[in-house]
């Protein structure tokens, strides 16, 4: 086999797959019913993303688990309803109706905004992927490393990831 690779943004990848510009995309995509309608998704995952919460270091004793965050009525940075992270929090809330996490819909924002909003106290946490936090904040060459002594991250769970395949006759095979 010979593959042609194209580096692109997450949004462009999804649009490109849907339009047929790309045949397959790997972006650490989580399974959602909406994605399963648009794309062919293999039955077996190829990896996993560890999702968790970026919080202020001063709050790391207060928020050690998702249950702590919910019980303390932590305020979460808004999430786009199209983002698979929305489904993760919705699923948590369905199972924990006594102490749900308030979800606020967002159109879009920059990750730098999310970190800044947590630091300034506008929100208590940003629902973040571990690898993203490590590359952006904890890595010495990370673009937000200046926040490393002010932010902390704790895990929620691992979520299987899948390649997404353009839905057409060729992709169905």
Question: Where are the predicted features?
Answer:
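Bilobed "Venus flytrap"/periplasmic-binding protein-like clamshell domains
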Residues: 1, 52-110, 131
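Short helix-initiation/N-cap motifs at beta->coil->alpha
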Residues: 4-15, 101-120
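Solvent-exposed loop/turn segments at secondary-structure junctions
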Residues: 10-13, 29-34, 58-61, 82-86, ...
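Hydrophobic residues within well-ordered alpha-helices
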Residues: 17-18, 53, 69, 117-119, ...
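Extracytoplasmic
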Residues: 8, 12, 19, 48-50, ...
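Extracytoplasmic small-molecule ligand-binding "clamshell" domains
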Residues: 1-29
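Periplasmic-binding protein-like
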Residues: 46-54, 140-173
């Amino acid at each position: 086999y010979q593959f042609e690779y194209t580096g692109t943004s997450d949004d462009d990848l999804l649009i490109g797959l849907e339009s047929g510009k790309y045949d397959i995309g790997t972006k650490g995509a989580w399974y959602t019913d909406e994605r399963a309608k648009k794309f062919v998704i293999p039955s077996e995952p190829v990896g996993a993303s560890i999702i968790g919460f970026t919080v202020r270091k001063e709050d790391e004793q207060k928020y050690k688990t998702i249950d702590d965050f919910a019980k303390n009525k932590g305020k979460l940075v808004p999430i786009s309803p199209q983002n698979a992270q929305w489904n993760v929090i919705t699923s948590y809330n369905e199972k924990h109706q006594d102490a749900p996490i308030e979800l606020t819909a967002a159109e879009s924002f920059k990750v730098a905004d999310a970190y800044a909003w947590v630091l300034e106290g506008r929100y208590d946490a940003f629902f973040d992927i571990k690898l993203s936090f490590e590359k952006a904040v904890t890595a010495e060459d990370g673009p937000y490393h200046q926040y490393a002594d002010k932010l902390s991250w704790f895990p929620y769970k691992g979520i299987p990831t899948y390649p997404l395949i353009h839905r057409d006759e060729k992709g169905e095979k």
